[in-house]
Amino acid sequence: MKVQILPSEEVLRGYDAVSALYPHIPSLSHWRAWEYASYRHHRIEGRILDVGCGDGRYFKLIWPTADNVVGVDMDPQAAEHGRASGVYRLVHTAPAHKIPEAHDSFDHAFANCSLEHMDHLDGVLAEIHRCLKPGGTLSCSVVTNRFIDWALLPLLVAEAGYGEAARALEKDFLDFHHLANPLTVEGWIAAFERAGFTVELHTPILPAYNSGIWGLMDSLWHVNRKAGGEIGSLIQPFLSANPKFPNAFRTIISGLLEMETDWNDCSGAVFSVRKVR
């Protein structure tokens, strides 16, 4: 297995690309920037299965020439958005451990930030393996155990003496992200291998400083408002009113990249794995 450490310049180019989709949602553009940069080292073509497809906008940004794509999403509304996008030839409303497609029928599969949310991980990976042709690959991004370990907001609130509020914030954060599988890197590799895959490429994403600031932004964004909804519904229009924000936030990410000291220990990972039988 090759470990690919991303140069800072590639992460920043990733931000330049994804900020066009999410210019005023900083936690989303930050995380997606690392994923985008990682996928530049992957190649998918032919008939493609997108597992947990959502609305297809990010898929189209990463793989603009892909034109034979089938999506799967268990959420009816997300699946409908995928159908309306024009990205997919077909979108199944189905759980990923029960994909209504034939054996050995896809050249590649893609699962962006979806596997960690799925309750039947071994079944999902086995189903992706079943659908892939021999030699086919899965490109995917996932979170690791550090995603929880480095969550700053509950820790800071607890340090201020508000233990009950800290526990509530942590629960809300985990409930929102529905993290069924915040595995270690070794745990992810073992899961892929159990399903019959061999891991060819691992790209660590979001080391400690990037991850800590990302988690703080994301946690604040999703804090529940007393009046209903999330704090993010107040933050986004505030940021949207400033046309300088996307470029200014790029400078912040650049500073965080300069601060990193360990690029292997990260809260996320991007993998390329291959079906070997």
Describe the predicted segments one by one:
Residues 1-98, 102, 263-271:
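Conserved N-terminal segment of class I S-adenosyl-L-methionine
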Residues 110:
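A conserved beta-strand element that flanks and buttresses the S-adenosyl-L-methionine
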Residues 113-117:
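Short catalytic micro-motifs in class I SAM-dependent methyltransferases
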Residues 118-122, 146:
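A structural helix-start
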Residues 122-137:
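A short glycine-rich, Lys/Arg-flanked "PGG" loop and its adjoining helix->strand segment in the class I
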Residues 139-165:
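Conserved class I S-adenosyl-L-methionine
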Residues 156-157, 190, 200-277:
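A C-terminal cap/extension of S-adenosyl-L-methionine-dependent methyltransferases
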Residues 171-187:
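Acceptor-substrate binding/catalytic loop of class I
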